[in-house]
């Protein structure tokens, strides 16, 4: 069985954050959030990671160069023009095609199981251990065997604005039944709520709702499925919302679950999630990292020179 690799989804400039938030240091040693993810990933057993090539120079300077002696690094393009024959990129569109397309862009670099994370989210040590162990112990049989790390909604919202989250429903076996992408969730009057109509109406969500933070574990089979589904997505998306439609990775997983062709084990995380959606979130992350170091979960310098 091939060793699992790690795919890091790094978007471009953070539209809500204002700048390349993935390479903004979160401690006095100059580490960025991704350093902590890679440290946890290596500790769990990962030996290779893949990241977008567009920001290669910035990432090499921030992470790649110091990581090269600890882990193998591959850079891949997520090219907006890389779409199936018969389709055209709408004139003026600059927005990438979304998480499904980002993972599909890595197809030539992946030859076995892999995990997927966001570059700018702190997932915690247990999450990497759980996903690595799952991928090392499970293979496809009569169904695709995938996994996802689940977080409590209350641990994943910010005080500084709205966030997008995948809301999860599970069965008695702790497997994912479906996942619904809510693109605008925020704290309102002491409760957590979402809107689907630009704030005209709001619906409350329980604090202990399980959500996806885009930490997935897959066998290589998902790449074939992403490739097969992409034309269908484009047909619909380019008609309904040509400038902004996104090919969401969880939507493809949901389709496979509904068709009973895959299972996705939900691995509950004991770790609190931290992330920087807005500039105002940064002090919270800095304080959290400081406390995690105090508790002995991380050394002061992650990568000893």
Language model features with spans:
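Active-site metal-binding loops of divalent metal-dependent hydrolases
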Residues: 13, 120-121, 153
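A C-terminal functional module that forms or caps the active site or interfaces directly
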Residues: 226-261
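Conserved N-terminal catalytic core of the sugar/cofactor nucleotidyltransferase
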Residues: 1-11, 31-116, 123-128, 136-137
